[in-house]
């Protein structure tokens, strides 16, 4: 066996060579300890973690610490968190959230040594998220401010798509804004690289090249091609989400708030028109369209958004185009004439400052729980009591002018409905109301869990296939995607017989001379007294 050389080609020892060519130790940055931060309060809780406001003790800088929740510790570190960390370390853009540090919280007591350390992601603290701002009744968006936010959102999206990254969960709650007017795209737990060309000016995205999971994007921001189970999708799915966010900023609340997959498609057809070979070619060939026969309708987007001007309507129609192959891309959307119309967009530093507004602050503003259906967990199917998500916040037969940013203002109405029971009130954009009481179900909270999901296939009319389980009555409870135990659908045993468990009942029976299984009758039976050999019963 040949002996390895003890020197490098230039005559130095391997150790000396390594020391001469090594990076300085100051260039390596490991993970901080959670004790390096002072926790200041909880900002929110999502599918994959909690977010806390904190201050770095060394510099005093405010950060957001995202606690990565280990739902199934035996499975190891969540793949979604690994993917998010990897992508955030690769990206660098003013409109993309930056990952600044990772922090570790080790078990403190000797008895907790078997527990795994808790990992936190540290990002710059942002004063608001767009969903929280839209729910803040003291905030009123004007057109120049909406244009400023839309330009920043499209700039960030163009950078992502130029980097061949799909976000796959574009929604208002994932858009962070600070009091300097800067908007940043956050939450890359569902993001991934995609195979395909990057967007070009004047060139539609066309067809996708490979299959991806369809269990992505929160329902209210989900494009029709995903609802119809297209697997070879493109960056056009993110553009649809931007269109939903744009309409939400104009109107003041989500414009496509469906209660289930089928309902989501129905309100999309109401807004954009029924699919046909002109506006959505070959839509019938999609797996989820086999049994669909939507009633003919022309769409009412122009009527509903007419008050916001022809430019806004034109951009919204391009962003929400049913045909994903010809849907506008971020490059062309940035050049849309609406941004050059009066009033012109504000500069970020010209946008007014607001009190801190995050998705969790909905309870502070309106004393209600979060309205959004939870984001799907990529690649898995969730089951749980909230399979149909939240109720719709948009009536397709109602003009958009009554939204909070519309001509009539007042997103949250007070009226005679406030004195009705919860199950009789009109549904808003919040949680589903409590069902009415009935004789067959004395306490609806005691119902068993829903049936477990079956294998993939044609969906029923009101079954949602991607909403993970949450107990909305207990917001601190972790999600559980494991299927529920088998449900026994047999009716309960009858309990309508009178039970003689008391001494008084037995005494009452004896006094009335009723028959009893536990003792002989006190008096002779008439048929026995008539017998010739009768001597009488003796006790």
Curated annotation (Swiss-Prot):
Chain's gene name: BUR1
InterPro entries the UniProt entry points to: CDK (IPR050108), Kinase-like_dom_sf (IPR011009), Prot_kinase_dom (IPR000719), Protein_kinase_ATP_BS (IPR017441), Ser/Thr_kinase_AS (IPR008271)
EC number: 2.7.11.22, 2.7.11.23
Gene Ontology cellular-component annotations: nucleus
Keywords from the UniProt entry: ATP-binding, Kinase, Nucleotide-binding, Nucleus, Serine/threonine-protein kinase, Transferase
Superkingdom, natural source: Eukaryota
Protein kinase domain span: 37-339
Name of one Pfam family that matches: Pkinase
UniProt region (Disordered), positions on chain: 1-27, 370-539
Catalytic activity: L-seryl-[protein] + ATP = O-phospho-L-seryl-[protein] + ADP + H(+); L-threonyl-[protein] + ATP = O-phospho-L-threonyl-[protein] + ADP + H(+); [DNA-directed RNA polymerase] + ATP = phospho-[DNA-directed RNA polymerase] + ADP + H(+)
Stated role: Serine/threonine-protein kinase involved in transcription regulation. Phosphorylates the UBC2/RAD6 ubiquitin-conjugating enzyme (E2), leading to monoubiquitination of histone H2B and the silencing of telomeric-associated genes. Also required for histone H3 methylation. Necessary for the recovery from pheromone-induced growth arrest in the cell cycle G1 phase.
Keyword Nucleotide-binding: yes
UniProt keyword Transferase present: yes
Location of this chain's protein in the cell: Nucleus
Comp. bias regions, Polar residues: 1-15
CDD domains documented for this protein: STKc_BUR1
Location (main, coarse): nucleus
Gene3D superfamilies: Phosphorylase Kinase, domain 1 (3.30.200.20), Transferase(Phosphotransferase) domain 1 (1.10.510.10)
Protein name: Serine/threonine-protein kinase BUR1
